[in-house]
Amino acid sequence: MGELLITGISNWVHINLKSKKIEKVTDQLIDAYQLEPEKTNFNERKLKKLKEPETYLNCIDYKIDLNWIDVNNHMNNIYYLELADMILPEEIRKSNNCSNFEIMYKKEIKYGDIIKCYYAEPENTSYVVTLKNAETGEICAIIKLYI
């Protein structure tokens, strides 16, 4: 068997696509998606909310490319890390010493959106990238990279 490369935890909600409001999940839907105990053998922990830094060191704008869009018409999750990598200073990117990361998704990113990528170093042990919609100013995601 291969080496474990990544684990993940998430909280899920059911959203009405028309109203964009959270809805109560039906028993029928719960029954359709049962846990697989053999695949949940890592320590569970409560998800904590990442906070937006008070100040930033740099900002770039990026227009979302069609190739980054998944079948749900949202930006694929891997590209959140790609955007974070694009804003990091070159010496940090070259050092390649990120040991862990967290992503807090707040709002979907879609094709053609212009995203402002903000970079901060709030601690000596991490970097934080905040992704905001340039038009609305809404936070789309906060990414924390640990060194």
Predicted regions: what they are:
Residues 100-121:
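Active-site beta-strand->loop segment that positions catalytic residues and contacts the acyl thioester
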Residues 16-97:
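Hot-dog-fold acyl-thioester-processing enzymes
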Residues 1-48, 109-111, 121-147:
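HotDog/MaoC-like acyl-thioester-processing domains
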Residues 7, 54-61, 100, 114-116, ...:
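Intrinsic-disorder/low-complexity, polar/charged segments enriched in Ser/Thr/Lys/Arg/Asp/Glu/Gln
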Residues 11-13, 61-65, 104, 146:
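Generic structural detector for well-ordered beta-strands
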Residues 9, 69, 101:
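Generic anion/oxyanion-binding catalytic loop in active/binding sites
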Residues 78, 103, 116-117, 125, ...:
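Intrinsically disordered, low-complexity segments enriched in small/polar residues
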